[in-house]
UniProtKB/Swiss-Prot annotation:
Residues 14-34 have a biased composition (Acidic residues). The gene is YSL1. Pfam families: OPT. InterPro entries: OPT, YSL-like. The keyword Magnesium does not apply. This is Metal-nicotianamine transporter YSL1. Residues 1-39 are annotated as: Disordered.
Length: 673
């Protein structure tokens, strides 16, 4: 997934966000009284058989959904709240069925809910960040051809076709090591520094709410989820009958006319993206639409008129020296400008905050902590009760680092063992910086650390092996930094729901194991059934091409760019930095309207249609909030989850039918009269 999911959905005005972080901690007085009066079960009883089963089911379903979203657009919304909601729905339904059948069912606690959510998110998180639509897919032959077979730096030897065996092995050796990096610092970051981790805290508040709000509201959420899940699934089934061959069906409906359709401006009736638009913030969705208008509405039609002047008119439309090169590298410039600025900003915030703490300067979070000291002490006591030994963390990290140093070069001979060792020497400090920054700002910078590693490794390895080494090394660094950050966010959730850290760590391990097995299988379900990486098809996988061309830039430098593309890249890079500066330095009423450059970059390659889908979702939420804000607040996650899961689940039978050679019977197409 490529867009940093936690990041693009949380940056709608940092002043508002800071207030929200503090208000989250001041909510639910009844919840805390109830929790303080209840005996917390030992960590071994917080992990249940039914909890593991439900987490696997949710994790598998979400892995398929995330894989589809990744391979189509690269935009995957944060599904943590959906996972918590589904866990509550499944287990509550299970419990009620057992009770009506005369069986005794164990009460469903917030700790078990937290465990299920953690495990499911760990599972689908590998589908989001495992590189199946970016750095790993960027190694295949199709992406090599799209990048330009005659392009300097794009060596014919830099190809590795996807394989179930090597992909599964790669995931197992790079994903687990991140779980051990920051375990020794959990007390420092959660208890001593009191970092907020807004995503983890928000999930905890949601889970606490499920278990205290009463049956009436929970029933409404369940009914809303089931209603829209059924509608979305049946709609996907209905659409399938009319999608006989390429460019057929409702997904190609020329909503705004055939001229607009040729420039990808149409509504494709995707309930998945409508649901994703309901979860993503208005700023994200409008940034996507702005990027679509800027690219397919203005730039690409203008550049197309320069065919024969700026680039030869006899080139294939997907040749990197034609207009396609501008699409790829301008989107790369936006992403790098946004990422570099955010990286420097978070680094500065982290250093400034550490310096302030060393000087014992009070801050707002400390004041909140003093006001709720009794509650905090109860949470801290529970959080510190089940200690994870230091020797366990150190031995786990060293063991997986040693295994990875041996296995990764066997999978990718171009990535030498000493590069792996150097990466793991720096990984703990990078992981700490990233996790600390995420605790303050809720921005997970793992992808940016990965991109830096990609450029460095690609540059030092050389032309023949640089692309493969850079892409593989990118995954190595990104996985360690990302997994450790997500675990720390989950520790924050555990702290607030009074769940044992040992139970959380075990849940992460379970989810990671399942994810390492399920994610490659779900990827190959799509890879075998659909035309993955086709720029004109549904599954464009834009980030595979973006990452490969980043590696080529690292190897070759700017000679890989088409005519005048470098100057345009400077402009877009500067625009990305400028937008961020304006957002941070101007008042919130101005800064909150600044677009997100990374979100703007996605339609450059994918097209405008999915941005329109997302904006339909944001329009639904906007109108709903105007009509009944209170109802919208607790129903939007349920309805959006239903829309995403319904059509997402239909993908499974659709893929099976495609593998079996069963084609839709009707082709619905629209032609000019």
């Amino acid at each position: 997934m490529e867009i940093e999911q936690r990041r693009i959905m949380k940056r709608e005005g940092e002043e508002e966000e800071d207030n929200n972080q503090l208000s989250l901690q001041e909510e639910e007085p009844d919840t805390e009284e109830e929790m303080s009066g209840r005996t917390i079960e030992p960590w071994t009883k917080q992990i249940t058989v039914r909890g593991v089963f439900v987490s696997i089911v949710i994790g598998v379903v979400f892995s398929v959904i995330a894989q589809k979203l990744n391979l189509t657009t690269g935009i995957v919304p944060n599904l943590n709240s959906s996972a918590a909601l589904l866990a509550f729905v499944f287990v509550q339904t299970w419990t009620k069925i057992l009770k009506k059948s005369g069986f005794v069912a164990k009460p469903f606690t917030r700790q078990e809910n937290t465990m299920i959510q953690t495990s499911a998110v760990a599972c689908y998180g590998i589908a989001v960040g495992g590189g199946f639509a970016s750095y790993l897919l960027g190694l295949n032959h199709k992406t090599y051809v799209l990048s330009g077979v005659n392009l300097e730096g794009n060596s014919p030897k830099s190809v590795k076709e996807p394989g179930l065996g090597w992909m599964t092995a790669y995931l197992f050796v790079v994903c687990f090591i991140g779980l051990f990096v920051l375990i020794p610092l959990r007390k420092v970051m959660i208890v001593d520094l009191k970092l907020t981790y807004p995503s983890g805290l928000a999930t905890a508040v949601l889970i606490n709410g499920f278990h205290t709000q009463g049956d009436a509201q929970a029933k409404k959420q369940v009914r809303g989820f089931m209603k829209y899940f059924s509608f979305s699934f049946l709609w996907g089934f209905f659409q399938w009958f009319f999608s006989g061959i390429e460019d057929c069906g409702f997904a190609q409906f020329p909503t705004f006319g055939l001229k607009a359709w040729k420039q990808t401006f149409f509504f494709d009736f995707s309930m998945t993206f409508v649901g994703a638009g309901m979860i993503c913030s208005h700023l994200v969705n409008l940034s996507l639409l702005l990027g679509a208008i800027l690219s397919y509405g203005l730039m690409w039609p203008l550049l197309d008129k320069l065919k024969g002047s700026w680039f030869p008119d006899n080139l294939d439309e997907h040749n990197m020296k034609s207009i396609y090169g501008y699409k790829v590298f301008l989107s790369v410039a936006l992403i790098l400008g946004d990422g570099l600025y955010t990286f420097v900003k978070i680094l500065f915030v982290t250093i400034a905050n550490v310096n302030a703490r060393l000087k014992n300067k009070p801050n707002d979070l400390d004041d909140v902590g003093h006001k709720k000291q009794r509650k905090d002490l109860k949470e801290d006591e529970n959080f510190l009760r089940d200690k994870i030994p230091m020797w366990f963390a150190v031995s786990g990290y060293l063991t997986f680092a040693a295994v990875s140093t041996v296995v990764v070069p066997l999978i990718f001979p171009q990535l030498k063992w000493y590069y792996v060792i150097v990466a793991y020497i720096f990984a703990p400090s990078l992981a700490f910086c990233n996790a600390y920054g995420a605790g303050l700002t809720d921005i997970n910078m793992a992808y940016n650390y990965g991109k830096i590693g990609l450029f460095v490794i690609a540059a030092v390895t050389g032309r023949e092996n640089g692309v493969v080494a850079g892409l593989a090394g990118c995954g190595l660094i990104k996985s360690v930094v990302s997994v450790s950050c997500i675990l720390m966010q989950d520790f924050k959730t555990a702290h607030y729901t009074m769940t044992s850290p040992k139970a959380m760590f075990a849940s992460q391990m379970i989810g990671t194991v399942v994810g390492c097995i399920v994610t490659p299988l779900s990827f190959f379900l799509f890879y075998k059934a659909f035309d993955i990486g086709n720029p004109n098809g549904e599954f464009k996988a834009p980030y595979a091409l973006i990452y490969r061309n980043m590696a080529i830039l690292g190897v070759q430098g700017f000679s890989a760019l088409p005519l005048h593309c470098l100057q345009m890249c400077y402009g877009f890079f500067g625009f990305a930095v400028l937008v961020n500066v304006v957002r941070d330095l101007t008042p919130a009423k101005i800064g909150r309207f600044m677009p997100l450059p990374t979100a703007m970059a996605v339609p450059f390659l994918v097209g405008a249609y999915f941005a329109i889908d997302m904006c339909v979702g944001t329009l639904i939420v906007f109108v709903w909030e105007k009509m009944n804000r209170k109802k919208a607040e607790f129903m939007v996650p349920a309805v959006a989850s239903g829309l995403i899961c319904g059509e997402g689940l239909w993908t499974l039978p659709a893929a099976v039918l495609a593998l079996a050679g069963v084609k839709p019977p009707i082709c619905m197409k629209f032609l000019a009269s």
